[in-house]
Amino acid sequence: MIYSRSRLPSEGEILIATVKQVFDYGSYVTLDEYGGLQAFLPWSEVSSKWVKNIRDVLKENRKVVVKVIRVDRRKGTVDVSLKKVTDDERRKKNLQWKKIQRLDKILELVSQQLKLSEKDAWEQVAWKLEAKYGDPISAIERAVKEGEKILIDAGVPEIWIKPLLEEAAKHTEEKKVKMSGLITVKTSEPLGVQKIKEVMSKALENIEQDYESILNVKIYTIGAPRYRVDVVGTNPKDASEALNQIISNLIKIGKEENVDISVVKK
C-alpha cells in the first residue's frame, strides 16, 4: 500500500485515481497515492468537449490521471478534474506512477522480511529518500550501483539497508521493447489537421493505464499521409496488444469522425 505524508492532497496536484462509481452528474474516484481517499469528479470536469454519455469517457475500476481543483481541509473533501490534465502532465504522471509501483513492491517485500509494517517502510525509507534526493526509487537504484552510503546519508536506519539493496537488485529496471506500426490517415473535413489530432488523442486515452508495463506511446507523421505508431514498454506481449488496441481505436474513432485510417504495416 502506498502511504503519503499528508492526509489530503494539495490543489493543483496531479494524481492517479481509480474510478469507483459513475453517475449522470459525475463520478466518485479514489486517490491511489492517498490511501484510497475518495474524491469527486464533477460532470463539468470530465471533458473539454461535449460528451453525450459520461460512461463513454469513464468506466468503473479504470485508472485515470486527475488534477486536484478543490480541497476542503475542514470537511476532508476533495474535487478533481480530468479535463484540466494536459497530455504532457498525463504522460509524466504515468511514468512516475510506474516508479511508485516498483518502489511500493520493493518496500512491501522488505517490510515482510523484517516483520515490520509497510507504513514503517514508507516512513523510514521512502520519505527519508524523498526528502534527501527527491525521487526515492532513483535513489535506491543509485544505491544498488554505488553502495549503501546513498541510503545512510539520507538517514535510512541500518536495519533496512542490506535487505533493501538485495531486494532492489532484483527489481532493477527491465529492458525496454518497442513495437511500431505504420498507418495512412486521410480526411476531406475542412479542419482536417485538427480533426486528425483529436482522433489520435482519443485513440491513446487510457492505454498507459490499461497496460502497466507500457512506458510511452506516440503517433507521429513520417510524411503525410503516413504516420508511425510507437509503443515502448517492458513486456513484449503487452506492447503488442497495446499497439493493436491503439490501431483498432484509430480505425473505429476515425470512422466516427470521417477520417479514413488504414494499416500499412504492423
Curated annotation (Swiss-Prot):
Q: Which GO terms describe its molecular function?
A: ribosome binding; RNA binding; translation initiation factor activity
Role this protein plays: eIF-2 functions in the early steps of protein synthesis by forming a ternary complex with GTP and initiator tRNA.
Q: Which organism is it from?
A: Saccharolobus islandicus (strain Y.G.57.14 / Yellowstone #1) (Sulfolobus islandicus)
Q: Which InterPro entries match?
A: NA-bd_OB-fold (IPR012340), S1_domain (IPR003029), S1_IF2_alpha (IPR044126), TIF2_asu_arc (IPR022964), TIF2_asu_C (IPR024055), TIF2_asu_middle_sf (IPR024054), TIF_2_asu (IPR011488)
* Stated family: Belongs to the eIF-2-alpha family.
Under which name does UniProt file this protein? Translation initiation factor 2 subunit alpha
S1 motif domain mapped to chain residues = 12-83
* Entry-linked PANTHER family: EUKARYOTIC TRANSLATION INITIATION FACTOR 2 SUBUNIT 1
Instruction: Give UniProt keywords alphabetically.
Output: Initiation factor, Protein biosynthesis, RNA-binding
- Entry keyword DNA repair: no
Superkingdom of this protein's organism: Archaea
Subunit relationships: Heterotrimer composed of an alpha, a beta and a gamma chain.
Which gene produces this protein?
eif2a
Q: Name one Pfam family in it.
A: S1
